[in-house]
Amino acid sequence: LRQDPALDGAQQERVADWLRAAAHQLISYEKPGALGNNHHYWRALAATSIGVLSNDNELFRFGVNTFKQAVGQEDSNGAFPLEMARHENAIHYQSFALQPLIMIAEFAERQNVDLYAYTDHGRTIRNAVTFLGHAIADPGIVKQYTSDEQKTNFSAGDVAELEFYFARFGAESAPNSLRNLLHNPATATRVGGNTTVLAGK
């Protein structure tokens, strides 16, 4: 939006105002005290990105707090319990939940808020990434959460957000299964398109 040469300053402000209003409406659907899952995280990513764009700290803080809530829900293995309840798609939903959370962390880093270092009961978002890698390598570890046979048809697009993670921590920071899965270029429309290019900027 800020780089679109077709929009002058007044038009950019008008669009930003509309996005801000839409984001506030979006998060108004949240029920106080409700437990978050990937739907909550995706709403939080929208709020975070628009909050940064429009200098709306309330929207930005909503995203930051949602990220912290997600880390707080990780179990001792790094799994998200609400996503583990997704039967044969448990591993896929662990992956799907990480997409918005990693992107929230990236937005926050650019606002000098280090969410990657945020710890709750001894765990960080990196534990969730590690669990995903282990589960992809050995779906049997999910049997403690669900008896359903796991779908394992993963592609680079399922973990495209990890381009940002690898750019920050190095590919060696994640299990081999994730490194082997993330072929370049990696693309996921939900997190901006070609993340290989975006993470390299």
Regions from the PLM with identified roles:
Residues 1-112:
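Aromatic-lined, polymer-binding surfaces characteristic
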